[in-house]
């Protein structure tokens, strides 16, 4: 016999009670009660609301899928928006302004300020307000696009089911046709060093220090290490980065660019110990930290004492306790989820994108994957050329690149030609009194096709997108050289470098 609750639900769906209430005075309909433990029905369930997850969720909803996005944290946006890309750019920008005002830069421009003081608390407030506005923006976009947001830790509990466990222990089950894992990454711990986010910090703690440390040691001179090291160096800290490799800027950076970049940072006061490894760190009774280092190849040990130790040795995929192994989805040796070219795991309706799959751990790479992944679910084509994904270091000057480096082309045996143009010869850079760096273009020797672009200088992060567009559409160096660029602009340096690559010489150098 059909239960009363099922009869009630059936009548409610048909609007039976509404018709009764309209027909009888004094009788009103009783709204159908929903229970937290009743499953939510979805077409697509996204686990994680970082750049890959939230973009995928919105695109999914725009394509007509009933979409749920599960996020374990209180705010949307993932690491990038809350404790990564966004807050770090606020501090990089504001610390650069302080550095200009506090040093000789403003005075050289005829701007004389008697006393420049740092209000770190206010600087942190501005960072927080930017983060708050953007996280709120995602919540608004979810509402606007009808994405259902479920707060809790998402775990796959069946090939068509995800269970979100909330902070209070309660659960919400989502029955879903497709599952998309976009859980991002977490800080890679350093063996033997415990991060307390007070004096031994990860990138998260480095974004919220209560005061400027007298001496800061950074383990790692990759992208995150030089960015956060730059922030505190500009604000007055004595900063030393210890790097195992023999160059700064991390994997993928062109070596000529890296060497010039290092020289500029050193001129600003940033110190580096390259080809050096950290063997341990000890907290002393006075609160300071002794960091033990030695040559990467082995040798005499040395101790560097600091007030704050920043650990920046990379990130690892956040793939534990997601229920993958229980379904037979095994991780690769680096903890990543194996997927095919449509981002499907070995279970076709379970997908993965972003930092949990192979490729660079970049927010914009995750965004692209999120969009094309759900387009693929809808039957569309799935294509991404990872050679066209740009990388940026947001120091001052900025560093940006896309495509192959000179070292990679040599290793692959590809014949190439080089075009360079210094910002010192660019009129806009001259008027801005900001002339460090250059643009370096790598073109195919016989076809002239652009193979790589490497930029060190002001606005490099914006300029590199022109290069990414050129690579995506297979442009030649001459194609770019023949595009009229507005004058005076920094982007003219990009055109001039392509002129040099295509014709052997630029115009203005």
Curated annotation (Swiss-Prot):
Q: Which GO terms describe its cellular component?
A: acetyltransferase complex; acrosomal matrix; branched-chain alpha-ketoacid dehydrogenase complex; cilium; mitochondrial matrix; mitochondrion; motile cilium; myelin sheath
Q: Which residues form the active site?
A: 487 (proton acceptor)
UniProt modified residues of type Phosphoserine: 285, 297
Could you describe the post-translational modifications of this protein? Tyrosine phosphorylated.
PROSITE patterns, alphabetically?
Answer: PYRIDINE_REDOX_1
Q: Which cysteines are joined by disulfide bonds?
A: 80-85
List the Gene Ontology MF annotations in alphabetical order: branched-chain alpha-keto acid dehydrogenase activity; dihydrolipoyl dehydrogenase (NADH) activity; flavin adenine dinucleotide binding; pyruvate dehydrogenase (NAD+) activity
Task: Tell me, in one coarse class, where this protein mainly resides.
Answer: mitochondrion
Which keywords belong to this entry?
Acetylation, Cell projection, Cilium, Cytoplasmic vesicle, Disulfide bond, FAD, Flagellum, Flavoprotein, Mitochondrion, NAD, Nucleus, Oxidoreductase, Phosphoprotein, Redox-active center, Transit peptide
User: What does the record give as cofactor?
Assistant: FAD
Q: Cell inner membrane: present as a keyword of the record?
A: no
**Known catalysed reaction(s)?**
N(6)-[(R)-dihydrolipoyl]-L-lysyl-[protein] + NAD(+) = N(6)-[(R)-lipoyl]-L-lysyl-[protein] + NADH + H(+)
- Into which family does the record put it? Belongs to the class-I pyridine nucleotide-disulfide oxidoreductase family.
* Record text on subunit structure and interactions: Homodimer. Part of the multimeric pyruvate dehydrogenase complex that contains multiple copies of pyruvate dehydrogenase (subunits PDHA (PDHA1 or PDHA2) and PDHB, E1), dihydrolipoamide acetyltransferase (DLAT, E2) and lipoamide dehydrogenase (DLD, E3). These subunits are bound to an inner core composed of about 48 DLAT and 12 PDHX molecules (by non covalent bonds). The 2-oxoglutarate dehydrogenase complex is composed of OGDH (2-oxoglutarate dehydrogenase; E1), DLST (dihydrolipoamide succinyltransferase; E2), DLD (dihydrolipoamide dehydrogenase; E3) and the assembly factor KGD4.
Other comment? The active site is a redox-active disulfide bond.
Q: What is this protein called?
A: Dihydrolipoyl dehydrogenase, mitochondrial
